[in-house]
Amino acid sequence: MSLPDPAELIRQMATDLNAHLSKRGISDPRFIGIRTGGVWVAQALLKALNNPAPLGTLDVSFYRDDFSQNGLHPQVRPSELPFEIEGQHLVLIDDVLMSGRTVRAALNELFDYGRPASVTLVCLLDLDAGELPVRPNVVGATLSLAPDERIKLSGPEPLALELQDLSTAL
């Protein structure tokens, strides 16, 4: 399988996001990236939008519903939101949407900070493998993977996608 170029996806996502926000009458949203890949995508997206807005970062490790099964990520860091959440229009950015559990955890954490006016979900990739009813408003590409395949994003400069075959990783 040939993977798309993240830089091309980001350019198209910037255009699509501007159109989405304009259609909804949103002119000054707050941008939040989900660590780690979502932060990288958010930084690239803000650059493509030529937008100097501050970027909030979320670490959803403590909010995940599979925390007791998978354990805690070894590099948990505090979330940093340099702006109010209450009443704001938010753009929540993640790298890869798979099960929807990371986005659910991010929404739970955001609502602990306040009640936003709206949340627009932006994802570089949607793997169309949702376990929860979560869909991005803006997506770079939708891919279908075999059960033993995963996508890894590396970055931040440059962003690169890698297809991993878990069946050969043993």
Swiss-Prot record:
One of its GO terms (biological process) is regulation of DNA-templated transcription. Keywords: Glycosyltransferase, Transcription, Transcription regulation, Transferase. InterPro entries: PRibTrfase_dom, PRTase-like, PyrR, PyrR_bifunctional. The keyword Kinase does not apply. Disulfide bonds: none annotated. Its EC number is 2.4.2.9. One of its GO terms (molecular function) is uracil phosphoribosyltransferase activity. The keyword Acetylation does not apply. It is an enzyme of class 2 (transferase). Signal peptide: none annotated. A motif (PRPP-binding) lies at residues 90-102. It catalyses: UMP + diphosphate = 5-phospho-alpha-D-ribose 1-diphosphate + uracil. It comes from the Bacteria. Regulates the transcription of the pyrimidine nucleotide (pyr) operon in response to exogenous pyrimidines. Also displays a weak uracil phosphoribosyltransferase activity which is not physiologically significant. Belongs to the purine/pyrimidine phosphoribosyltransferase family. PyrR subfamily. This is Bifunctional protein PyrR. It comes from Pseudomonas syringae pv. syringae (strain B728a).
